[in-house]
From Swiss-Prot:
GO terms for cellular component: cytoplasm. InterPro entries: AB_hydrolase_1, AB_hydrolase_fold, Peptidase_S33, Pro_iminopeptidase. It is found in: Cytoplasm. This is Probable proline iminopeptidase.
Length: 323
């Protein structure tokens, strides 16, 4: 099973979501089809055209957006004067609700990758009445334990890269909240300091979470690199803005709020970025979910993962029934 053919949007726009922010959105596929919204990763990445291809364009009304500060949304997080205090998980969920209402959609399927899975899960827990299904891959829950693994624990597997990662920080900042320490550098008034920090952060990302060549190439764009690093460290350094109790994971703690929402979780067994054990616990706390484990696959679950994602969206387009 291959991805659906490339398609172009039939409509797009910039939605004023307040706080001086305008969010880019686009719609593809069938204007009268089953609504689905796609949540990209990062935080701070963008909605790439390839994400349109996980849905049957004859069956779905596919909505994509660039989250605050990312991609084509304005202002960009890469601009040093962009106010990041109005870029939080609560703001992003409110933006989704504004967009849903703007497009006249009553309920929609939520499809998320990596950080998009965290946002999608929390959105569904907060607004369960508007979510028909969840399809998630490269699944994370945004817990502090996951951030500690990504910024410290993986140093046991990639010691040389981790040494370089720590070397960019002042010595007195290497034992504390590493994302917050990097974020302070990325907020520096000195452009050279900001650029070194952005490059060091994305170098660590590419060393530990292998991705398709196209995804790695984007880090060579200074504007993308800066916006991505600034946004990720802003979220990771602030507990993903998920509130108290996130050391062990607010999303799994509140999994009961997903009751009645069908979901499909697709995870590579060798995903160092989001360990399978986290997804396993989420799956068992959410009885309405199906878990597809892709053997010997990483954060990008590859062709087998794509097949599972396509099977999920095809199934939900048929009302949740298998072929």
């Amino acid at each position: 099973m291959s991805l659906y053919p490339e398609i172009e949007p039939y409509d797009h726009g910039m939605l004023d979501v307040g706080d001086g922010n305008h969010v880019y959105w686009e719609t593809c596929g069938n204007p009268h089809g089953k609504p689905a919204v796609v949540l990209h990763g990062g935080p701070g990445s963008r909605a790439s055209p390839g994400l349109r291809r996980y849905f049957d364009p004859a069956a779905y009304r596919i909505v994509l957006l660039d989250q605050r500060g990312a991609g084509r949304s304005l202002p960009r997080a890469s601009a040093p004067d962009t106010d990041m205090s109005v870029n939080t998980t609560a703001h992003l969920m409110a933006d989704l609700e504004r967009l849903r209402v703007h497009l006249g959609i009553e309920r929609w399927l939520v499809w998320g990758v990596s950080w998009g899975s965290v946002l999608g899960l929390r959105y569904a827990q907060t607004h369960p009445g508007v979510v028909t299904e969840l399809v998630l891959t490269g699944v994370a829950t945004g817990s502090n334990a996951e951030v500690a693994l990504l910024t410290r624990g993986l140093g046991n597997i990639f010691p040389e890269a981790h040494e370089r990662f720590l070397a960019e920080l002042p010595p007195d900042a290497r034992d504390g909240n590493l994302p917050a320490a990097y974020n302070r550098l990325l907020e520096s008034p000195d452009p050279a300091v900001r650029e070194r920090a952005a490059r060091a952060w994305t170098d660590w990302e590419t060393a530990t979470i292998p991705a398709p060549p196209g995804s790695v190439a984007r880090y060579q764009d200074p504007d993308f690199r800066m916006g991505f690093a600034r946004t990720v460290t802003h979220y990771w350094g602030n507990d993903h803005f998920l509130g108290d109790g996130n050391d062990e994971g607010v999303v799994i703690r509140d999994a009961h709020l997903l009751k009645g929402i069908p979901g499909t979780l697709v995870q590579g067994s060798l995903d160092f970025g989001n360990l399978l054990g986290i997804v396993w616990r989420l799956h068992h706390a959410w009885p309405d979910s199906d878990l597809v484990i892709v053997d010997e696959a990483g954060h990008d679950a590859g062709t087998t993962g794509d097949e599972a994602l396509l099977a999920a969206t095809d199934k939900y387009a048929r009302g949740g029934t298998a072929e």
